[in-house]
From Swiss-Prot:
Known role: Increases the formation of ribosomal termination complexes and stimulates activities of RF-1 and RF-2. It binds guanine nucleotides and has strong preference for UGA stop codons. It may interact directly with the ribosome. The stimulation of RF-1 and RF-2 is significantly reduced by GTP and GDP, but not by GMP.
SUPFAM superfamilies, per database record: EF-G C-terminal domain-like (SSF54980), P-loop containing nucleoside triphosphate hydrolases (SSF52540), Translation proteins (SSF50447)
Keywords: Cytoplasm, GTP-binding, Nucleotide-binding, Protein biosynthesis
GO terms classed as biological process: regulation of translational termination
Matching InterPro entries: EF-G-like_DII (IPR053905), EFG_III/V (IPR035647), G_TR_CS (IPR031157), P-loop_NTPase (IPR027417), PrfC (IPR004548), RF3_C (IPR032090), RF3_dom_3_sf (IPR038467), RF3_GTP-bd (IPR041732)
Segments forming domain tr-type G: 14-283
UniProt protein name: Peptide chain release factor 3
Pfam families: EF-G_D2, GTP_EFTU, RF3_C
Disulfide bonds: none
Species whose genome carries this gene: Trichodesmium erythraeum (strain IMS101)
Gene name of the encoded protein: prfC
Binding annotation for GTP: 23-30, 91-95, 145-148
Length: 542
């Protein structure tokens, strides 16, 4: 590798940061996302999630159903520049039914931001997603939100993180007051107090007063009890708290903690500044040939998301690619690891929710959008030079199953197109009866809302009204050994065998007990709760 190419790649890597935000529903994730964009200069005014008509819709919530309901139901990518760095912000669905989409997004992230509601602390969805971050050893930054509302004591919230998640905590800033008396935060990095003023609905960047802790005017700016409480808290943190350890942050053992209020912009810019300093740059990825450095000269990347109809006018399909190594260039020809085919990557795009702009090149850590003519599947690797294939992204085990019926035969073409495209992007898993005569697709979802989203999008994007018929199953297991082993076992009690989109056998059980009973009676059956990663095989279409 030439010194010039290595230097170009290293410079690009040093300037890049990316992260995904994880949280429980209603912790304020979309609001925080908007405010980070506001401070990053990517938008001029933030839009409330549950917007009045006069207000803007949140930038990241671009799908029609998201704007109607005020919830995020698909991951979006938001890219902006801040302080000479390029930040890729991967906004994820907060609703628990879409945890699979979040899981796929975390595969493309180098860092995670864990968002907590100060009144609620750790919540079930946050814990679940934390486990995924822990498994991937992602650095985790914690933002404790809604400090301008009544909430739990900061020390109690830190203790909960340490005891329940096993993380060391380091508060980078510390709140001054809570609820109506929340005045701002103390920045421990620079030993400065930031006193904030509310902006109208938090739509503009907050104006704040910055003073040193020893400044005589502090006692005039703060109520006496808040001032003495702050000094007492800081002494306690210095005496009993952990010291900041960048290595432990990068290995996911320590979480830097920030306090603030995304709605009123308190503490958002301080978080962004510290994130740039502490976050992990794009790093190595595990592959079939071992660990690959981002400065490896040949381009490689993987597909972590597919999205149909980002621009409903053009009925397009976009593949979201995480660039892992080398330099991506427009119109380059690459190899597709799963099929062995060569693909020309034309019309690459920089993404910003549903908005896109053409790009000429991209570097490790970047997320780019490529037109998908039906070639790509989630988890696919594309590469130049020597074959490299990254670890695939497994499917979650669904818990809700239903036939999707098309009551209007004249709409079959649109119905088929919608089902195939929504399957490709992972909006829902699609299964089929093992009986070839029954061709109605079976929707396999993590939660009820996923089924509603499929029906809404079939109507809104494909013009097809559908009917859902629920099935009495709650557990799915993939069968090792394929159909041959199932035929040897014969009929199973209270169980139905279906095939997934790749033609592999999946057993559906009415409940967990039913599943355990079959495993106990048939030890020769090896059952998995995640789908095996496929290679060199095309999925079945309707």
């Amino acid at each position: 590798m030439s010194i010039e190419i290595e230097a170009e790649l290293q410079t690009a890597v040093d300037k890049r940061r990316n992260f995904a935000i994880i949280s429980h529903p209603d912790a304020g994730k979309t609001t925080l996302t908007e405010k980070l964009l506001l401070y990053g200069g990517a938008i001029q005014e933030a839009g409330a999630v549950k917007a009045k008509r006069a207000q803007r819709h949140a930038t990241s919530d671009w799908m029609a159903m998201e704007q109607q309901r005020g919830i995020s139901i698909t991951s979006t990518v938001l890219q902006f520049d801040y302080q000479n760095c390029q930040i890729n912000l991967l906004d994820t669905p907060g609703h628990q039914d879409f945890s699979e989409d979040t899981y796929r997004t975390l595969a493309a992230a180098d860092n995670a931001v864990m968002l907590e509601d100060s009144a609620k602390g750790l919540e079930p969805q946050t814990r679940k997603l934390f486990e995924v971050c822990k498994m991937r050893k992602l650095p985790i930054f914690t933002f404790i939100n809604k400090m301008d509302r009544p909430g739990r004591e900061p020390l109690e919230l830190l203790d909960e993180i340490e005891q329940e998640l096993g993380l060391k905590t380091y508060p980078v800033n510390w709140p001054i007051g809570m609820g109506d008396r929340f005045k701002g935060v103390f920045d421990r990095r620079k030993e400065q107090i930031h006193l904030f003023e509310r902006s109208i609905h938090g739509r503009k960047a907050a104006v704040n007063t910055v003073v040193n802790l020893g400044d005589p005017q502090i006692e005039k700016l703060l109520d006496q009890d808040l001032y003495y409480q702050l000094k007492e808290d800081l002494e306690l943190l210095d005496e009993l708290g952990s010291a900041l350890d960048l290595e432990q942050i990068h290995t996911g053992e320590m979480t830097p903690v920030f306090f603030g209020s995304a709605m009123t912009n308190f503490g958002v810019q301080l978080f962004l500044d510290a994130f740039l300093e502490y976050a992990l740059k794009p790093g190595i990825h595990k592959s079939t040939v071992g660990e690959v450095s981002p400065t490896y000269p040949n381009f490689t990347g993987f597909v972590f998301k597919l999205q149909a109809n980002m621009d409903p006018k053009h009925r397009d399909r976009v593949a979201f690619i995480r660039v892992c190594t080398g330099k991506f260039e427009k119109d380059m020809t690459v190899s597709h690891a799963r099929t062995g085919k060569t693909v020309r990557l034309s019309r690459p795009q920089k993404l910003f929710a549903q908005d896109r702009a053409s790009i000429e090149n991209a570097y490790p850590g970047d997320i780019i959008g490529l037109n998908n003519p039906g070639v790509f599947a989630i988890g696919d690797t594309i590469y130049n030079g020597k074959k490299i294939e990254y670890e695939g992204i497994p499917c979650f085990s669904p818990e809700i199953f239903a036939y999707l019926r098309n009551p209007n035969p004249s709409k079959f073409k649109q119905f088929r197109k919608g089902v195939n495209e929504l399957r490709e992007e992972g909006a829902v898993q699609i299964m089929y009866s093992a009986d070839e005569a029954k061709r109605d697709p079976i929707l396999a979802a993590v939660g009820q809302l996923q089924l509603e989203v499929v029906q809404f999008r079939m109507q809104n994007e494909y013009g097809v009204e559908t009917r859902v018929e629920m099935l009495p199953f709650t557990v799915a297991r993939w069968v090792d050994g394929g159909w041959e082993i199932l035929q040897k076992v014969g009929r199973l009690f209270n169980t139905v065998a279906v095939k997934d989109s790749w033609g592999r056998p999946v057993l559906l059980f009415k409940n967990q007990w039913n599943c355990q009973q079959v495993e106990s009676e048939h030890p020769e059956l090896k059952l998995n709760n995640t789908a095996p990663v496929v290679s060199g095989q095309e999925p079945e279409s309707l």
